[in-house]
Design a protein with these regions (language model features):
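Small-residue (G/A/S/T)-rich helix-start motifs and N-terminal tracts that mark the onset
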Residues: 1-138, 147-164, 169-292
């Protein structure tokens, strides 16, 4: 039985807080593509996520991108700490070296985003699966990371950490196929009941929060459902999903942290990961309405 819930209010911000109080978000993304005569850099997505996380109130952002992109990332998001991820001669990530770099630099992380601009290679998949197997804080699985997860061997898809998946309908169907859930392909676009049913099934199968993006975004944690009627077609543009992922991670870092409980009596109760995601969706949608 799924309980429909209202979006929670934004928790009070600790007036005595500092940048360490409000959590650290790590963004893992970006990739190098193309060929030597026409190189292609995929850097905008993770940088948008990083800027959104900061604007949504987290104290610190760490931006982990392929080493050749690191100087550009610093220019685009000077507030962030940038980690250059080792790559081979072809520009592909080196998973073991990436793991060492992340382990050394992200010990204080309160939430991760992985996927924006990451690419779909086997090295990126290995980085994703290792992160999911070795972290205890929320991970927002976005963009390319959703496809990588859907393609991974079933044994590797047993989540060991709390996670939020942020699929659009096409990615949601890809996830369902990878998980061998029986659905009618191509049926959920514009069909609220079908979208709701698939969102619920994915959340329950994965034991994760599913944020099904689209007109009337749905959020489900397997027991509770949130939705919004806000937002408009201004969100139908490249980068808006990267921004949402950053906001979700920022709220998870601020309001779902273990040490949030210590401040609860004086300021506000911590949120569940589903509540933090629903609140992020509402803020994202209201921002679009403000611009319309």
């Amino acid at each position: 039985m799924i309980t429909d819930c209202t979006t929670p209010s934004l928790p009070a911000r600790d007036p005595q807080g500092h940048k360490g109080t409000f959590g650290t978000v790590v963004i893992i993304g970006g990739s190098l593509g193309g060929h030597s005569e026409a190189p292609r850099m995929m850097l905008g997505g993770p940088c948008l996520s990083a800027r959104a996380a900061l604007r949504a109130g987290c104290g610190l952002v760490v931006l982990a991108v392929p080493a050749p992109l690191a100087p550009h990332a610093i220019e685009l998001v000077p507030e962030a700490t940038v980690i250059p991820l080792p790559v081979d001669a072809s520009g592909m990530l080196q998973p073991s070296a990436v793991a060492a770099a992340l382990d050394a630099s992200t010990k204080g992380a309160n939430a991760f985003v992985i996927g924006p601009g990451l690419g779909l290679g086997i090295a990126a998949e290995q980085v994703l699966l290792r992160l999911l197997a070795n972290t205890e804080v929320p991970v927002i699985i976005d963009a390319d990371a959703i496809t990588l997860f859907a393609q991974a061997h079933d044994a590797a898809r047993d989540l060991r950490t709390s996670a939020v998946f942020t699929p659009h309908p096409g990615e949601a169907q890809r996830l369902a196929q990878g998980l061998e859930l029986e659905i009618e392909l191509g049926f959920i676009e514009g069909n609220h009941a079908a979208r709701r049913a698939l969102t619920t099934r994915l959340a329950q199968r994965l034991g994760a929060v599913i944020c099904m993006k689209g007109a009337g975004t749905l959020i489900c944690d397997g027991l509770h459902m949130w939705s919004t009627t806000r937002g408009n077609a201004a969100l139908a543009t490249a980068g808006s999903g990267d921004i949402l992922a950053g906001i979700i991670a920022s709220f998870a870092a601020q309001f779902c942290m273990r040490n949030a409980t210590a401040r609860a009596s004086e300021h506000s109760q911590p949120l569940t990961l589903g509540e933090a995601t629903a609140l992020a969706v509402e803020v994202h949608a209201r921002a679009a309405d403000a611009w319309a």
